[in-house]
Amino acid sequence: MIIVAVLLSFLAHLLVQASQPWKALDAEQALYVYKRCYEDHLPSGSDRKTYMTLWNAWRLEPNDAITHCYAKCVLTGLQIYDPQENAFKSDRIPVQYQAYKTITQSKQKEVTEYQKALAAANAKSGSCVDLYNAYLPVHNRFVNLSRQLYHGTVEGAAKIYAAMPEIKQKGESFHAYCEKRAWKGNKQSEWKNGRRYKLTGSPELKDAIDCIFRGLRYMDDTGLKVDEIVRDFNLINKSELEPEVRSVLASCKGSEAYDYYVCLVNSRLKQHFKNAFDFHELRSADYAYLLRGKVYENPEKVKEEMKKLNTTVHF
């Protein structure tokens, strides 16, 4: 039965991918990838700053296992590489270009050359080192172009944010962003109840929770990402709750974001979930939060820092 369930999940993923045209990544989506891959792959030792300096400059160095897996993380996150197909997706390059060509000022000829070079790259086993070796020559040749296409410069990303006020801005939490989208300035008392974790079940609250779950990367079009929710419990020093978190989510009836939200709020995990959810709200306003060495202390500290949120740029 487990094998059948896994197979059905995989087939569902493929069907979702096949039925929807690929969408270009905006500046928020790209920034999330870069910072998350830093979080997951930067070493904790004395050479951490060296890696960060090199990666910030888009240099895939040093040539070691750490950089290899960082490169795979970014390629996967930017959807240049598809792990399900174990293939580089060269057909997505012109889609990314067309979406932002008036802002990036990239040249069609160079984009075509980049696409051809990526199409010729062989992912082989799909391991970190194989992907690194396959993509490195492409990267070195087209690094300036790829930085333009995937919003990898401060100036370029700023132009995208300015041109797209409809996406979450830097310094704005996903909770605040989704509140604006769902309520459009109306029914403020209802959203305040939502902020207090009251389950009103209103269409606006359901829309807001769906938006937040997607923004925090708890969900995407393929379904719930349980590991991401577990990670948030780990980040508030509650890793021992992982089995219970997984159990609550697995036994939850329904498949919408609000369904899972209700299950967590109504479970014995409620207070810990609130702490994890609030801490992620803070981090969602500043994707460099953890990279600056900041860690979870307590709920009061999170509330204090939330009051200080502004539009300070952290890139």
From Swiss-Prot:
Q: In which tissues is it expressed?
A: Distal-lateral and median lobes of female salivary gland (at protein level). Not detected in male salivary gland (at protein level). Expressed in female salivary gland. Not detected in female carcass without salivary glands. Expressed in male salivary gland and other tissues.
Q: Which GO terms describe its molecular function?
A: odorant binding; toxin activity
Q: Which InterPro entries match?
A: PBP/GOBP, PBP_GOBP_sf
Q: What is one process in the GO biological process aspect for this record? A: sensory perception of smell
Query: Which segment of the chain is annotated as a signal peptide?
Result: 1-18
Where found, per UniProt?
Answer: Secreted
Keyword set, alphabetical order: Disulfide bond, Hemostasis impairing toxin, Platelet aggregation inhibiting toxin, Secreted, Signal, Toxin, Vasoactive, Vasodilator
Q: Report residues binding thromboxane A2.
A: W55, Y70, K170
Q: Which Gene3D superfamilies match?
A: Pheromone/general odorant binding protein domain
Induction section of the entry: (Microbial infection) Expression is not affected by Plasmodium berghei infection (at protein level).
UniProt superkingdom: Eukaryota
Family, as annotated: Belongs to the PBP/GOBP family.
Protein function:
Modulates blood feeding of female mosquitoes on vertebrate species by binding and sequestering different mediators involved in the host response. Binds leukotriene C4, leukotriene D4, leukotriene E4 and stable analogs of thromboxane A2, U-46619 and carbocyclic TXA2. Binds weakly prostaglandins: PGD2, PGE2 and PGF2alpha. Does not bind leukotriene B4, biogenic amines, ADP, platelet activating phospholipid derivative PAF and arachidonic acid. Inhibits agonist-induced smooth muscle contraction.
Q: Output this protein's name.
A: Long form salivary protein D7L1
Q: Which organism is it from?
A: Anopheles stephensi (Indo-Pakistan malaria mosquito)
